[in-house]
């Protein structure tokens, strides 16, 4: 079973090697930043590393909460899910597969997991007990426009649905071959919920009905909970937390930077270690 803090440590050690060879961090600042419709350039290893150091800890436990809910629902409703197929769309580093590993006690037999992403991410799982898995360099557009058929019973969007076009999402239900599936979507931003509306309308137009099983919206700051308290787990490593927060100190040219405030805003931020960004929905979809 994954030890999340060991995973964070491994990424941090690699990231430090990258930083040791950089005189300035201007490129990292611009390539790794979310703003407007700009998505970080995940083709670059350093961007993957910084993204995971900031968000992997919280995302793994958010997805664990989602899978735990799903498996408990199956147990209560006597649903036999052994041997099921899971499709993770926009899988990235496979964080939801690590989350599945944390739910290992729910899995009696083999589950088949497929992750697709246009980018071949590093830091993906190498071995997960009771789960057969594979990753493909593939985007949703190719999946829904080629002669593909989807037999997966669970379709997971890990913070990724906002990255896909409405046209591609509309085609997804036409590829579904199972009579009942479960849609699990974690939203990176509240505005991404509009993409869900498009997807659900397409399911209805293609002969499906849906039932919302769980809907967790983003909470206010005053209601956030530290994940290590919530789940009785190790806290995010303090030394790495402090380092990431003062990342701009690693820039050798920070003293002559023309826009130090911009550097602070884009580089210097704490990793997420609370449930403040938990924002997801789980839906049962049935063919009629």
Predicted feature descriptions by range:
Residues 112-117:
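Conserved SAM-binding motif I beta-strand of class I
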Residues 2-3, 137-288:
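Domain-level detector for long C-terminal conserved domains
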Residues 1-34:
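N-terminal auxiliary segments of SAM/dcSAM-dependent transferases
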Residues 93-108:
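Conserved SAM-binding loop of SAM-dependent methyltransferases across substrates and taxa
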Residues 52-67, 92-96, 120-122, 165:
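Phosphate/oxyanion-binding active-site loops and adjacent basic polyanion-contact surfaces
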Residues 37-77:
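Class I SAM-dependent methyltransferase Rossmann-like catalytic core
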Residues 122-134:
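Short, conserved SAM-binding/catalytic segment
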Residues 82-92:
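Conserved class I S-adenosyl-L-methionine
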């Amino acid at each position: 079973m994954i030890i999340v803090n060991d995973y964070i440590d491994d990424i941090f050690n690699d990231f430090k090697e990258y930083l040791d060879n950089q005189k300035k961090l201007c490129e990292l600042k611009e390539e790794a930043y979310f703003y407007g419709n700009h998505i970080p350039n995940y083709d670059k290893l350093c961007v993957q590393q910084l993204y995971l150091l900031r968000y992997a800890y919280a995302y793994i436990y958010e997805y664990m909460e989602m899978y735990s809910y799903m498996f408990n629902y199956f147990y209560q409703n006597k649903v036999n899910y052994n041997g099921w197929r899971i499709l993770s769309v926009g899988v990235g580093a496979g964080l939801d597969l690590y989350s599945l590993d944390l739910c290992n006690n729910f899995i009696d037999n083999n589950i088949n997991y497929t992750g697709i992403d246009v980018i071949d991410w590093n830091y993906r799982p190498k071995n997960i007990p009771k789960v057969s898995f594979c990753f493909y360099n593939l985007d949703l557009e190719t999946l829904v426009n080629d002669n593909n058929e989807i037999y997966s019973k669970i379709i997971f969007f890990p913070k990724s649905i906002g990255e896909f076009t409405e046209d591609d999402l509309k085609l997804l239900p036409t590829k579904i071959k199972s009579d009942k599936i479960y849609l699990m979507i974690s939203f990176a931003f509240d505005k991404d919920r509009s993409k869900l509306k498009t997807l659900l309308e397409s399911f209805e137009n293609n002969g499906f009905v849906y039932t919302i099983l769980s809907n967790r919206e983003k909470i206010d700051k005053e209601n956030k909970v530290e994940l290590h308290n919530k789940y009785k787990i190790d806290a995010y490593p303090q030394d790495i937390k402090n380092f990431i927060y003062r990342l701009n100190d690693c820039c050798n040219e920070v003293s002559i930077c023309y826009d130090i405030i911009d550097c602070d805003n884009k580089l210097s931020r704490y990793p997420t270690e609370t449930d403040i960004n938990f924002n997801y929905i789980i839906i049962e979809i049935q063919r009629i």
